[in-house]
């Protein structure tokens, strides 16, 4: 039984059930409710509005049924259950009187069975009804609109019969009875089963090996796949005070019903930096589906690569896209396609690398026909919007910069792929190296080389470390420090393996590089041309035009493109987009065909085509032209900004002093190399100074602050790659701010190393805000060199553990300028308490410590209290969202009783009861400095509040007391009123969220306006 109250309590779950399937499932529930006469015809018409989001219709249905009383609620739950059961094993047999005297009524009573019987025959029935004059041509065309599935067309025919009085209902009742009964579900048809089998085989073959990261051998995905840090994006600012940082998720959470930004959208977005493992994640999804291990709710999975789709020049339809560009049905093409249209909820489409799709997303051109051809970009954009294959799931991967606000409107859930955790790096290396001792030595090398360890949180760098393990373990010099160092190491690895045996033991010396310089320049020219033309997949004709021969290809940087339709000639692509950028930078540094002046376009990150001149420049071919400068400049101007930034950083690294001798031996003119270096230095300094000049003046009374623009981090990265201290000093000379914000900027360990390299030269200390990034423990270690230039450091929501904070504090003890630390929303436990206590005890100029939303218990609070006893400077202490309990509150209260400087204390959401409140009340009686005490979200109850009220009577400093959501009744409020009568200092007492009646709230507010209810 289900009462109306129980029904209302289940409302959110019922909405989830109704919208979790497809529109077909929702309409089958309406069929049942109509046939049981739970819904009237007027109710039904209000629930079948075309174009309305399914969630709106579901809520309207719940409202309609609730108004019909307990019986209606029970019937809806029964209909949901029956619809779920019938989707597994439908009962197609229905019995009705074909010669009924009330045909319209019988059509409604037997509607579910009639819809199922009509499903496979609706086109023939429409033709017959038109021929016999029961419907007009206009009515027939309306029912046959391509946006409707076969079952929806059947329902619309029945709806028409209900309102027409010309015998259509009697005709249908008689004719449908004669139709053959299907003995199985439509997708059990031989054609569909054969197609599903073929599709699984093809997807399994395409996804079993990781060929994109290796030109010499294939790596079995099952053997080396390592979970990446995947977090769901939430709307910042929408969460309450106890909002936790996103938890790391598994692949199975991609289609979870939680965390929806837009529950009516179909598209799941996965964003991550270049090399973070987006393509490999999709490949693992494909493999798990194809081998039957997961994602079996989908009958069909269609993988696509955006870099390959953009090469499709001719118009194509949904059918062409699925069949010609993924998997062709050997038989029954029309039947298979019709099933796909009828069951979109059983389809998953994946689109990898949207950042490599040269067309910018727009929703201006609507295309709703699955059979009419259109351009590839219009087709893709309408699939993502849901105008085509609505309710089919689509997964889109991209680098963050390529995702516009327009596109995010159509995103159901957004995930952030943050790369490997420290444990992930170790696990990956152990999977790659099962020989005794090799993985241990590599892991030890990383742990003792923080710069290299910081790079490896991106899987592409972990792969490089694995690939170059011999070079790393045997080399006498220092380990790679910059991204450029790492790519030169992998270049050395590829060159050695392609060289004669007697040269295989050499490092990347001039002779090894010179021997392959023509090959590298040809590959670099192809890479640059591809970047400028947004071309990442190269045909045989394009390779021939670039004079790239089989010997060049054998070097290993070009591999067969994945996801190629069987039987077609496989085009080639670079191992990874970052390799394409690296080789393009190599060409720009060493080619005699590149004028030095062209390099300035690398550091000017305007959108391609932003000037009239760039739009007038002709499309250029790979071969050189007599206008060399305009050719290179045009390609750089048309390169996507994120690829341009990566290329610029590589160019800066190649022109560093570290690699000067290596490149000078390969460059005919050392003077030319020096000119390029000078040009890059000038461009970097100029771009940074221009950036700093754009900072608006400070608001009167506030510190001058700067929120980094997108290009700022890449300029800093380029400075770091160049490794020139003097240039870093000159660059920050113009930075005159007190607060530097880099929130939500994708700052990882590598970016931390670059920031530290530059910011340590600041003349005036700054407050550095790095909230909502991926700093982690390794990133904290990278930041240590610039800690002396920071007066405040904000690291909210950065996946930092005790180990990282202990290292930070060890260094901070010697940094006189550092006065504030914000560490909330991390993974801190009692294990860091001794270090934090030491910080408080030793730094007598320290002002603010915020440790909210971590995992500190009473034990940690007791240790911290010892540090507080020896501290005389702290003004702000944030502990909200921990688990200190009564014992922890007692320890902190005792330590703060005679503290002379603390003004603000937050213990929100710490499981504090009346015992802890009594200790805090005793503290209030003695403390003469505290101005604000935040105790919301605890369970103080009246006993605890009465104790606090006694403390207030003897307190002369507290101005704000926050007691919201503490189960306080009128008794506790009365005690507070008595205390307020003798306390003129206190200005506000927050009592929101406590169980007061409206009458009590009105009475309390009239008695003292300082009570905020």
Swiss-Prot record:
GO terms for biological process: adaptive immune response; antibacterial innate immune response; autophagy; canonical NF-kappaB signal transduction; cellular response to lipopolysaccharide; cellular response to muramyl dipeptide; defense response to bacterium; detection of bacterium. ADP-binding promotes an inactive closed conformation. Residues 1-82, 107-178 form the CARD domain. It is a lipid-anchor. LRR repeats lie at residues 764-785, 789-812, 817-838, 845-857, 873-893, 901-922, 929-949, 957-978, 985-1005. The keyword Repeat applies. Residues 214-247 are annotated as: Required for CARD9 binding. ATP binds at residues 272-279. InterPro entries: CARD (IPR001315), DEATH-like_dom_sf (IPR011029), Leu-rich_rpt (IPR001611), LRR_dom_sf (IPR032675), NACHT_NTPase (IPR007111), NLR (IPR051261), NLRP_HD2 (IPR041267), NOD1/2_WH (IPR041075). One of its GO terms (cellular component) is protein-containing complex. Keywords: Adaptive immunity, ATP-binding, Autophagy, Cell membrane, Cytoplasm, Glycoprotein, Immunity, Innate immunity, Leucine-rich repeat, Lipoprotein, Membrane, Mitochondrion, Nucleotide-binding, Palmitate, Repeat, Ubl conjugation. ADP binds at residues 212, 225-226, 275-280, 576. CDD domains: CARD_NOD2_2_CARD15. Belongs to the NOD1-NOD2 family. Homooligomer: homooligomerizes following muramyl dipeptide (MDP)-binding, promoting RIPK2 recruitment. Interacts (via CARD domain) with RIPK2 (via CARD domain). Following RIPK2 recruitment, RIPK2 homooligomerizes via its CARD domain and forms long filaments named RIPosomes. Interacts (via CARD domain) with ubiquitin; inhibiting interaction with RIPK2. Component of a signaling complex consisting of ARHGEF2, NOD2 and RIPK2. Interacts with ANKRD17 (via N-terminus). Interacts with HSPA1A; the interaction enhances NOD2 stability. Pattern recognition receptor (PRR) that detects bacterial peptidoglycan fragments and other danger signals and plays an important role in gastrointestinal immunity. Specifically activated by muramyl dipeptide (MDP), a fragment of bacterial peptidoglycan found in every bacterial peptidoglycan type. NOD2 specifically recognizes and binds 6-O-phospho-MDP, the phosphorylated form of MDP, which is generated by NAGK. 6-O-phospho-MDP-binding triggers oligomerization that facilitates the binding and subsequent activation of the proximal adapter receptor-interacting RIPK2. This is Nucleotide-binding oligomerization domain-containing protein 2. The lineage of its organism: Eukaryota, Metazoa, Chordata, Craniata, Vertebrata. The gene is NOD2.
């Amino acid at each position: 039984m289900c009462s109306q109250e129980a029904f209302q309590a289940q409302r959110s779950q019922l909405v989830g059930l109704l919208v979790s399937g497809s529109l077909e499932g929702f309409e089958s529930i309406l069929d049942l409710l109509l046939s049981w006469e739970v819904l009237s015809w007027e109710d039904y018409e209000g629930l079948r509005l075309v174009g309305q989001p399914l969630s709106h219709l579901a809520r309207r249905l719940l409202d309609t049924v609730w108004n019909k009383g307990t019986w209606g609620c029970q019937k809806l739950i029964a209909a949901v259950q029956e619809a779920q059961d019938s989707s597994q094993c439908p009962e197609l047999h229905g019995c009705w009187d074909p010669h009924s005297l009330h045909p319209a009524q019988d059509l409604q009573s037997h509607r579910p069975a009639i819809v199922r019987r009509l499903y496979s025959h609706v086109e023939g029935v429409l033709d017959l009804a038109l021929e016999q004059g029961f419907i007009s041509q206009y009515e027939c065309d309306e029912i046959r609109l391509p946006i409707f599935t076969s079952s929806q067309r059947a329902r619309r025919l029945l709806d028409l019969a209900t309102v027409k009085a010309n015998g259509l209902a009697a005709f249908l009742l008689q004719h449908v009875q004669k139709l053959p009964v299907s003995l199985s579900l439509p997708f059990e048809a031989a054609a569909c089963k054969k197609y599903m089998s073929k599709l699984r085989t093809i997807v399994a073959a395409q996804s079993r090996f990781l060929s994109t990261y290796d030109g010499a051998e294939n790596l079995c995905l099952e053997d080396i796949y390592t979970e990446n840090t995947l977090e769901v994006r939430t709307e910042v600012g929408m969460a309450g005070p106890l909002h936790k940082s996103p938890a790391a998720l598994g692949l199975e959470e991609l289609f979870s019903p939680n965390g929806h930004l837009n529950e009516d959208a179909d598209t799941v977005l996965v964003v991550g930096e270049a090399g973070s493992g987006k393509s490999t994640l999709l490949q693992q999804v494909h493999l798990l589906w194809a081998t039957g291990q997961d994602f079996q709710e989908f009958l069909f999975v269609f993988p696509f690569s955006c870099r390959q789709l953009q090469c499709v020049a001719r118009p194509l339809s949904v059918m062409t896209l699925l069949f010609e560009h993924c998997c062709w049905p050997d038989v029954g093409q029309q039947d298979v396609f019709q099933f796909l249209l009828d069951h979109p909820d059983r389809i998953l489409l994946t689109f990898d690398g949207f950042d490599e799709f040269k067309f910018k997303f727009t929703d201006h051109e609507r295309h709703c026909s699955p059979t009419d051809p259109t351009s590839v970009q219009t087709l893709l954009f309408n699939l993502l919007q849901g105008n085509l294959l609505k309710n089919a799931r689509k997964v889109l991967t991209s680098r963050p910069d390529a995702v516009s606000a327009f596109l995010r409107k159509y995103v159901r859930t957004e995930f952030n792929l943050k790369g490997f955790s420290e444990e992930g790096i170790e696990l990956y290396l152990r999977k790659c190296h099962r020989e005794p001792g090799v993985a241990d030595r590599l892991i030890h090398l990383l742990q003792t080389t923080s710069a290299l360890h910081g790079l490896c949180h991106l899987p592409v760098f972990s792969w490089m470390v694995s690939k170059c393990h011999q070079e790393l373990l045997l080399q006498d010099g220092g380990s790679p420090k910059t991204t450029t160092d790492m790519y030169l190491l992998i270049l050395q690895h590829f060159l050695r393996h392609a060289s004669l045996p007697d040269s295989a033991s050499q490092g990347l010396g001039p002779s090894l590089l010179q021997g392959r310089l023509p090959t590298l320049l040809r590959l670099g020219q192809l890479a640059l041309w591809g970047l400028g033309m947004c071309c990442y997949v190269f045909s045989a004709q394009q390779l021939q035009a670039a004079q790239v021969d089989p010997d060049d290809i054998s070097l290993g940087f070009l591999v067969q493109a994945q996801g190629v339709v069987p039987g077609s000639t496989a085009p080639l692509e670079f191992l990874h987009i970052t390799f394409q950028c690296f080789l393009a930078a190599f060409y720009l540094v060493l080619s005699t065909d590149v004028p030095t002046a062209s390099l300035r376009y690398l550091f000017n990150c305007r959108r391609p085509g932003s000037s009239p001149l760039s739009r007038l420049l002709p499309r250029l071919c790979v071969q050189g032209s007599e206008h060399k400068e305009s050719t290179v400049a045009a390609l750089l101007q048309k390169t996507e900004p994120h690829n341009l930034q990566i290329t610029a950083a590589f160019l800066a690294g190649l022109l560093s002093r570290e690699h000067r001798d290596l490149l000078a031996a390969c460059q005919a003119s050392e003077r030319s190399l020096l000119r390029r270096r000078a040009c890059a230095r000038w461009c970097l300094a100029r771009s940074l100074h221009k950036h700093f000049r754009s900072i608006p003046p400070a608001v009167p009374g506030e510190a001058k602050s700067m929120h980094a623009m997108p290009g700022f981090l890449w300029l800093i990265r380029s400075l770091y790659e160049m490794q020139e201290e003097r240039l870093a000093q000159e660059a920050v000379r113009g930075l005159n701010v007190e607060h530097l914000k880099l929130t939500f900027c994708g700052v990882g360990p590598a970016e931390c190393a670059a920031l530290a390299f530059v910011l340590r030269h600041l003349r005036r200390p700054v407050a550095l805000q790095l909230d909502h990034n991926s700093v982690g423990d390794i990133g904290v270690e990278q930041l240590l060199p610039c800690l002396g230039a920071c007066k405040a450091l904000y690291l909210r929501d950065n996946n930092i553990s005790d180990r990282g904070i202990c290292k930070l504090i060890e260094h901070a003890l010697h940094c006189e300028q550092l006065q504030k630390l914000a560490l909330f929303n991390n993974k801190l436990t009692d294990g860091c308490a001794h270090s934090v206590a030491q910080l408080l005890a030793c730094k007598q100029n320290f002002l603010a410590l915020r440790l909210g939303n971590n995992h500190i218990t009473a034990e940690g609070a007791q240790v911290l209290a010892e540090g507080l006893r020896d501290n005389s400077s702290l003004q702000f202490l944030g502990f909200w969202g921990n688990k200190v309990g009564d014992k922890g509150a007692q320890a902190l209260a005792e330590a703060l009783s005679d503290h002379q400087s603390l003004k603000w204390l937050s213990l929100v959401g710490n499981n504090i009861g009346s015992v802890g409140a009594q200790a805090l009340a005793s503290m209030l009686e003695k403390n003469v400095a505290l101005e604000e005490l935040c105790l919301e979200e605890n369970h103080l109850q009246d006993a605890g509040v009465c104790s606090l009220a006694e403390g207030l009577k003897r307190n002369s400093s507290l101005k704000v007391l926050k007691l919201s959501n503490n189960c306080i009744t009128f008794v506790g409020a009365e005690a507070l009123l008595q205390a307020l009568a003798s306390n003129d200092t206190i200005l506000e007492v927050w009592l929101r969220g406590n169980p007061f009646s409206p009458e009590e709230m009105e009475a309390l507010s009239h008695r003292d306006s300082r009570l905020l209810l």
